[in-house]
């Protein structure tokens, strides 16, 4: 009886205590822009409680015993703030905090268990230490990702990642502010992703993940995905002028439209523009032109709602020297930077509108809505085989399309608590519709005469998806992320060359489950296991002839990795990974034919190291190995052409308090097979770049050098069968685009 009485008394006291608990809520702002700051780590010292600010910079702690608490707010490249607040019974203390910017201090960086499933620690460090200053660096910010340009700078880069020759985007999902970059059923190749509509100076953050493990990332996210986020506000207005070798000129300007008055109302708007011209280092002038114009508004229309509107337009036109065969250079027919068909080139444009709306309801539901629209035009002239098919007129082809793309992304998420466990549930829907007119493959001569139409048609492609994602934090150390998405595709192709003109369609769907585990031993060590299924869609010109069969090949992957700090000022991310892909049929855009592609298997190791050597000097290095093989083929004939087997990139970054900053970087890719039996080899290269800037409050002066040691290297390489005019028989060998020689560029920026 006495025990029952004591238990009853204890319950009464506990209930009374619970009835008089308090809380803390707050908003964190970027001091320079006065806009809310997301992903800030907020810790209640000594309690084990922590939170991460949401899209609106908000955080909340509930059920706190009345007392005095010490709060610590931290974010990469912002100065950590520590202060005290008193919690009283039945009240929620509300705080507004501004974080000032500061140099990155790796000693203050911790491995957070709150956002284990995001794993953006490395990317957050890189974007602060290695600001993106040219269009090629936009993609190179992703560890292990290599690119190659083989069309004079106007064409989308060829991408290599995790044992994939991704071509121009088939197996990596790229977005900008959530808007898709990859183009389905593109005239040149499936998943073609041209990022040149992004002004490098406006990139604020890059989120990425390798492998098919993220529930809200659908089509093309097999090798991985990357989302490039542009600035919501400019710190200052600026004008930048650059000039370099090979008749290279560039002008960039960004104007803050609302200024201090806008910041006081948590609003910002700017307009920015970029113009580039170069004749480049090839023997034949490239006459490359590019124009970008961007306008963006970001504002809090209510305390719990923000609206972001972005409009942009992009245009580019160029000539290029194409891919040249080894034998033409070795025989002296052309120089290393020469051309067989100097009339290759192209023109492209893209106009975008993007609206994003985020709100947090009184019950803490986070609702996101996004609508986007793009008008896109593309025309490319190429000649890969010279006179192989047509010994009189040559083999030049034209690939052309006009496209309207529109879509919607929406999600609703809520954090709930069951006992001491946290459950974040997200339900999302996505819709994308591509309407392409006049998608053409033609035989041309000198970019002036059409000799024959190989393919001509209209494409109507729809992708609708729904997904459910759950992040469960069972303890402060252990969390699980489980999700599933369903994607539905409907493809329609109208063949305008058919007699009579005919229209056919097909449809299919795919289910992609994900299951990820994270265990954070302490603020210096986290172990994770990622598993999941992803896919990439196939060209409509494959889907329709195949009747919707074998056109959504699944990719099954797993990563076992860890993030740890062996020393206070060192961060290491290491992972062993595996990926298996189903057989599929693919459309070869350069030939207009459908070919089978067999099963494939890849596995390898990734290692990324970030180390602060001194208060102002930082070192980074990435090492990536892969063993890509075709499944079901004989040993020795099962190589995957051009798939990278070893890559590495790294360097030193300097950030002096007096305004001097710079970097010295290298990138290396090893020899790799260029065909299935490795009898033709694509040679590797080691190239170094340098950048040096001196920045004060009103101006900046900079020098950048690509290929610092003037290495002669082949940026892209292909095993191609071709015939040069006058040759009796065709020859299969390496065809390449030369990489830049030593290339220096000076820049001056004025801030106001």
Language model features with spans:
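Short acidic/polar hinge/loop motifs at secondary-structure boundaries
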Residues: 180-210, 228-229, 295, 547
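Gram-negative outer-membrane beta-barrel transporters
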Residues: 413, 476, 488, 576-580, ...
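C-terminal beta-signal and adjacent terminal beta-strands/loops
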Residues: 4, 619, 671-672, 694-752
